[in-house]
C-alpha cells in the first residue's frame, strides 16, 4: 500500500472535526491550539491544461468552441462516438431522456448545447459511464481518444495504449480504434492542420516555440515520423509546465513578502500543492488560483485567453472517497 501524505498537525483524533469543517467551513469546533497547529492541503490544478493550449494553437474552430462555451471535450466526443448507445443507457438509468433528445443533441451546434433541457442529464450520464464495466466505459474511450488524437497517434498504437492504461480491461478492435480516431479528426480538422503545420515548421526551421515564446531546437539529424508525436506535444506540454513554474514562483514571492505561514509542498507539472492554517484556506485558495490563471495569447490569431484552474482541499494528499477517505482532497462548497 502506498504512503499517503498528511498535512502538518492532522491526526485521527481530530478527524471528525476536520470532516465537519470540510463540509461546513465552521471553525468553531476547533480549539485555539488546533487552529494554530493544524494545516490543510490546498491543491490547484490547471483545468483543461494541454487541451486548452492546443485549442488556441489551432485555427479557431469547434475544438476551441468547447472551451469557450464550457463543454467538456470528453463528454462531447462521448456523445458523438456513441450516439447510438445513450438512449438505451438512459432507459436503464431511468432518465427521461428520449431517443429524439439524443438525436437532437448529437446534431446541435456546440454553442447551443446548454440550451437543450436534456443536456444536463445527458452529459451527467456520459460522465458516469467512466465507472461502468469496461465494455461500456464510453467516457473512458472518449477521454483516451481526445488525449491521443491531439498528438497524431495511429490506430495500432492507440489500441495498445488503451490496453496498457486500463491494465488489460479495455480491449478495442482495429475497426473500433480507427473509427474513434477518424471520427475525432472529422469533428476537429483544425487539429489535423496543427499537426501538419508543426511538421512543416520542424522540417523547415528545426525549431518550435511555446506560447511564452521559448524555443525548442530539434537536434535530430532528420525530422522523421518517429519524433512527430514528441513535436506535436511539446508546445502544449511545455506551456502547461511553464504556467505552473510561474505560479509556483509568484506564490513563493507572495508568501515571503506577506510573511504568510504557508508552505509550497509540490510542483506536479499542471498543479501545485500548498498547506496553510485552517483560517487562511480561502485566501490561500484564491491566491493559488489567481497565480495559475495566467493570460495567454494564441500565436495563430492573437486571441487572448486565460488558463483556468480548480482547487481542492483536504488533510491528506489523496482524492476524497466517500466512506473511505472523507478528509481527502475535495472541492469546498462554502
Residue ranges, per PLM feature:
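Conserved catalytic core of nucleotide polymerization and phosphodiester-bond processing enzymes
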Residues: 1-334
Amino acid at each position: 500500500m502506498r504512503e499517503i501524505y498528511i498535512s502538518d498537525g492532522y491526526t485521527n483524533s481530530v478527524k471528525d472535526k476536520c470532516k465537519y469543517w470540510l463540509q461546513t467551513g465552521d471553525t468553531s469546533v476547533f480549539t485555539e491550539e488546533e487552529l494554530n497547529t493544524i494545516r490543510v492541503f490546498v491543491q490547484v490544478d490547471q483545468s483543461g491544461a494541454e487541451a486548452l493550449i492546443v485549442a488556441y494553437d489551432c485555427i479557431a474552430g469547434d475544438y476551441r468552441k468547447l472551451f469557450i462555451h464550457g463543454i467538456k471535450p470528453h463528454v462531447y466526443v462521448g456523445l458523438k462516438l456513441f450516439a447510438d448507445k445513450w438512449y438505451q443507457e438512459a432507459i436503464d438509468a431511468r432518465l427521461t431522456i428520449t431517443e429524439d433528445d439524443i438525436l437532437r443533441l448529437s446534431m446541435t451546434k456546440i454553442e447551443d448545447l446548454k440550451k437543450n433541457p436534456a443536456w444536463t442529464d445527458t452529459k451527467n450520464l456520459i460522465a458516469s459511464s467512466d465507472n461502468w464495466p469496461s465494455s461500456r466505459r464510453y467516457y473512458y474511450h472518449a477521454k483516451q481518444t481526445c488525449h491521443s488524437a491531439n498528438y497524431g497517434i495511429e490506430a495500432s498504437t492507440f489500441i495498445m495504449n488503451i490496453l496498457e492504461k486500463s491494465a488489460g480491461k479495455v480491449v478495442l478492435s482495429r475497426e473500433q480504434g480507427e473509427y474513434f480516431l477518424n471520427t475525432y479528426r472529422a469533428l476537429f480538422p483544425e487539429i489535423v492542420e496543427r499537426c501538419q503545420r508543426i511538421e512543416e515548421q520542424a522540417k523547415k526551421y528545426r525549431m518550435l516555440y511555446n506560447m511564452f515564446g521559448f524555443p525548442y531546437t530539434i537536434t535530430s539529424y532528420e525530422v522523421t515520423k518517429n519524433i512527430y508525436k514528441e513535436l506535436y506535444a511539446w508546445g502544449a506540454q511545455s506551456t502547461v509546465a511553464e504556467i505552473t513554474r510561474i505560479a509556483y514562483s509568484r506564490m513563493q514571492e507572495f508568501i515571503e513578502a506577506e510573511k504568510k505561514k504557508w508552505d509550497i509542498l509540490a510542483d506536479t507539472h499542471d498543479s501545485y500543492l500548498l498547506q496553510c492554517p485552517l483560517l487562511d484556506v480561502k485566501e490561500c485558495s484564491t491566491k493559488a488560483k489567481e497565480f495559475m490563471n495566467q493570460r495567454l495569447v494564441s500565436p495563430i490569431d492573437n486571441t487572448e485567453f486565460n488558463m483556468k484552474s480548480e482547487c481542492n482541499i483536504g488533510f491528506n494528499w489523496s482524492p476524497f472517497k466517500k466512506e473511505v477517505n472523507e478528509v481527502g482532497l475535495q472541492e469546498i462548497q462554502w
